[in-house]
């Protein structure tokens, strides 16, 4: 019975070993030279099968106690690189193999969690509870990431301020020191004043108070800067610009005292010397009714109104600007004008009040065969102007002499030509015409003319400087 029971207790591995041995034994034997090489090969085969079976336990115990075989281990993902590779340091497959119930290789990332939260609404209560926990975990994770970023930014800014202050203090100290004998930090660091210790302690980080034991210096609050003198009112300014409310209040108090004094009349009796008071009947003062036009309710007094108008005119005069000519074409009334050059004409040199004075002098000379003459026209209108004309007439004619000249017309840009004819019986060596008048109207001299004839008009542009 023992051999049968032993055969029943044999494991599949032993049966596999026996089957392999029988397979090798059933094959035809080779010569003696080859029989020696088959025996070690058969033992090697049986050893490899035995070691594969005993990978997770002892075969003797499993044979005696009858334990069941462990399920085969899952292989890692094919796309995951092995830790022996130089391109990765992932050990998740080791953790997944050792801690099967606590670790999974599939991690829920940001995209998967966002899609799960957005697509919630399932009827499964367990799934909804899982999504709630996932959402809370994601919120806590994001909050901690924000806190870490904020702390990192705060520490970076504190270090930058510390470096800037240290460099500034070092440059100021080197202005008076040629060379420092000891190469040490020349100034004390101000990092402890740039960082927030409460914030560091709140997030369980090392603060400057952990390694600085000296007490903080007591600094009083800064005092308020006094009011500068230029912003205070002077004595004359206070006297001149008194508030209107103060004046009205003083006037009302004065009027109230006068009314109270007038209400009582004190009389003295000569016999009893008793003062008696006689009350006067109060005269009811009718208040002015509200006018129909409410705009006249708050009217100003005449002096105040004049002052306001004067101030308004001064402000308008200061703020009056010419229209910008760049927005108007030159043919418009306000277009093409300059903002700097005034539009009015410049004043003429000389006296403007003086009236224009005309003076015409004519002289003649006898020449065989004819009589020559010369006319000098002097114009005084702001500045002296002299115009001259010469001419001659034959002596055989009935006219012994003739004069001609030019006159300026103030009414328009034209020059008037005129001539004077002298009769016989006048000495040709004497001046023909010496007169102060206006040649425009043909005024004659004192006895020198017989008549003056007006000739023709010639359009001529005349520039008066």
UniProtKB/Swiss-Prot annotation:
GO MF annotations in UniProt: alpha-tubulin binding; beta-tubulin binding
Keywords, in A-Z order: Cytoplasm, Differentiation, Spermatogenesis, Tumor suppressor
Composition-biased stretches (Polar residues): 11-38
Localisation per UniProt entry: Cytoplasm
GO cellular component: cytoplasm
InterPro entries tied to this protein: DLEC1
Region (Disordered): 1-38, 322-350
Top-level taxonomic group: Eukaryota
Cytoplasm among keywords: yes
GO terms (BP aspect): cell differentiation; defense response to tumor cell; negative regulation of cell population proliferation; spermatogenesis
Function, in words: Essential for spermatogenesis and male fertility. May play an important role in sperm head and tail formation. May act as a tumor suppressor by inhibiting cell proliferation.
Quaternary structure annotation from Swiss-Prot or TrEMBL: Interacts with alpha-and beta-tubulin. Interacts with BBS2, BBS4, BBS5, MKKS, TCP1, CCT2, CCT3, CCT4, CCT5 and CCT7.
Protein name, as recorded: Deleted in lung and esophageal cancer protein 1 homolog
Organism: Rattus norvegicus
């Amino acid at each position: 019975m023992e051999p049968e029971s032993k055969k029943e207790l044999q494991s599949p591995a032993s049966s596999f070993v026996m089957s392999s041995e029988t397979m090798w034994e059933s094959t035809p034997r080779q010569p003696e030279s080859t029989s020696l090489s088959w025996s070690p090969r058969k033992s090697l085969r049986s050893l490899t099968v035995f070691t594969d079976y005993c990978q997770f336990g002892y075969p003797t115990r499993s044979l005696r106690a009858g334990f069941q075989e462990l399920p085969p281990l899952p292989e890692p993902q094919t796309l995951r690189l092995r830790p022996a590779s130089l391109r990765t340091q992932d050990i998740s497959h080791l953790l997944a193999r050792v801690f099967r119930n606590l670790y999974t290789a599939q991690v829920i990332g940001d995209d998967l969690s966002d899609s799960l939260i957005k697509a919630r609404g399932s009827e499964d209560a367990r799934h909804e509870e899982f999504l709630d926990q996932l959402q809370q975990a994601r919120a806590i994770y994001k909050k901690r990431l924000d806190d870490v970023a904020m702390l990192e930014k705060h520490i970076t800014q504190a270090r930058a301020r510390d470096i800037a202050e240290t460099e500034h203090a070092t440059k100021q100290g080197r202005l008076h020191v040629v060379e420092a004998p000891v190469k040490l930090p020349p100034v004390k660091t101000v990092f402890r004043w740039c960082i927030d210790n409460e914030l560091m302690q709140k997030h369980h980080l090392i603060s400057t108070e952990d390694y600085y034991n000296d007490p903080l210096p007591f600094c009083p609050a800064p005092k308020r800067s006094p009011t500068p003198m230029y912003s205070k009112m002077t004595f004359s300014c206070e006297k001149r610009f008194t508030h209107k409310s103060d004046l009205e209040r003083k006037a009302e108090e004065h009027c109230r005292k006068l009314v109270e004094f007038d209400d009582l009349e004190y009389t003295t009796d000569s016999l009893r010397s008793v003062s008696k008071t006689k009350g006067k009947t109060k005269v009811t003062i009718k208040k002015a009714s509200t006018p129909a036009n409410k705009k006249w309710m708050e009217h100003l007094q005449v002096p105040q109104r004049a002052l306001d108008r004067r101030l308004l005119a001064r402000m308008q005069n200061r703020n009056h600007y010419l229209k910008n000519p760049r927005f108007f074409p030159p043919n418009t009334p306000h277009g093409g004008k300059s903002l700097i050059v005034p539009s009015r004409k410049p004043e003429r040199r000389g006296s403007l009040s003086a009236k224009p004075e005309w003076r015409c002098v004519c002289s003649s000379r006898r020449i065989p065969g004819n009589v020559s003459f010369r006319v000098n026209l002097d114009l005084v209108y702001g500045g002296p102007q002299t115009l001259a004309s010469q001419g001659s007439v034959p002596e055989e004619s009935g006219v012994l002499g003739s004069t001609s000249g030019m006159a300026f017309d103030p009414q328009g840009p034209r020059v008037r030509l005129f001539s004077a004819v002298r009769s016989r019986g006048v000495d040709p060596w004497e001046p023909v015409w010496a007169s102060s008048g206006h040649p425009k109207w043909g005024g004659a001299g004192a006895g020198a003319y017989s008549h003056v004839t007006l000739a023709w008009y010639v359009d001529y542009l005349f520039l008066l400087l």
